């Protein structure tokens, strides 16, 4: 789920924190990708006649097809992906996981009703909501990525928090996920829509945490409290508090503690035994692997093993897989060129000189003529 309404809130209150880009603009960038989120997307999106793709043995292959081809697309555009997999969910997430299971069961009932009525649109709609990612899907995804030469990181807990840790450690440029709580975990740069199919023509949204904090005029702790008020995976929020009011309350009272002390109990319902402090600590000090000594390596794909796994075991086309392997090898050759900005450090002095030069150029253009009028050029 992530954080309810955070993307729109940032667009409304801190628009300078968002920009849109084409995938080619990330050439040479290393990106930590929320693997579980991506695999779940592929299970929902990569389908045939409304059903997940399967091989002759009836095994699901949507996740493998999506992972293989979308990863190749990123690599062809010069991106170096690192896939981060979820570990054990935190105790605070148990309520959210139970709600998700209830929603899946309800969707299953609605899908069955749609089948009885022959309603194709609703069959597809509700069937997608019943999709569940299994440990087997994740293990197969890891195997595929390693054979492709793409680094895999196993998070001890939440993948988004591990991605954020990699960004903070300078190991990667950004976190690639659809879950906005990557920002709440402290990822300074977050990319949405990175693993979407090219056919959807969705620009990549790039969020900058630092800009959001500056424009909102919030500290990181206040931003986390805002996210808890909006609604997160780890606890309920105060009933009656929407995004606009949440911003106003943080601006006025600065913390959830003071909000709870001052708001009207007649207007707003604060959850009993509300574990917002535990949720706050989870965002501030998540369970992650230390990244400082972590070595991320992109290696040559193992063509023979990929053919064995995807063709012999999973029923993919050998010609397509071998062409994919060729694309990976070619992409590795071009991505090693790196980005131009990785060779230089832009200092504040350099920025100031550039600004001063622009001012001087502006003065020259605006030089008045003898009669006090501006010269035409």
From Swiss-Prot:
Belongs to the XPG/RAD2 endonuclease family. FEN1 subfamily. Structure-specific nuclease with 5'-flap endonuclease and 5'-3' exonuclease activities involved in DNA replication and repair. During DNA replication, cleaves the 5'-overhanging flap structure that is generated by displacement synthesis when DNA polymerase encounters the 5'-end of a downstream Okazaki fragment. It enters the flap from the 5'-end and then tracks to cleave the flap base, leaving a nick for ligation. Also involved in the long patch base excision repair (LP-BER) pathway, by cleaving within the apurinic/apyrimidinic (AP) site-terminated flap. Residues 94-121, 354-377 are annotated as: Disordered. Its EC number is 3.1.-.-. Phosphorylated. Phosphorylation upon DNA damage induces relocalization to the nuclear plasma. Mg(2+) 2 binds at residues 179, 181, 233. This is Flap endonuclease 1. Residues 336-344 are annotated as: Interaction with PCNA. Residues 361-377 have a biased composition (Basic residues). Binds 2 magnesium ions per subunit. They probably participate in the reaction catalyzed by the enzyme. May bind an additional third magnesium ion after substrate binding. DNA binds at residues 47, 70, 158, 231, 233. It is found in: Nucleus, Nucleolus; Nucleus, Nucleoplasm; Mitochondrion. Its cofactor is Mg(2+). Interacts with PCNA. Three molecules of FEN1 bind to one PCNA trimer with each molecule binding to one PCNA monomer. PCNA stimulates the nuclease activity without altering cleavage specificity. Keywords: DNA damage, DNA repair, DNA replication, Endonuclease, Exonuclease, Hydrolase, Magnesium, Metal-binding, Mitochondrion, Nuclease, Nucleus, Phosphoprotein. The gene is FEN1. Mg(2+) 1 binds at residues 34, 86, 158, 160. GO terms for cellular component: mitochondrion; nucleolus; nucleoplasm; nucleus. The keyword Acetylation does not apply. InterPro entries: 5-3_exonuclease_C_sf, Flap_endonuc, HhH2, PIN-like_dom_sf, XPG-I_dom, XPG/Rad2, XPG_CS, XPG_DNA_repair_N. It is an enzyme of class 3 (hydrolase).
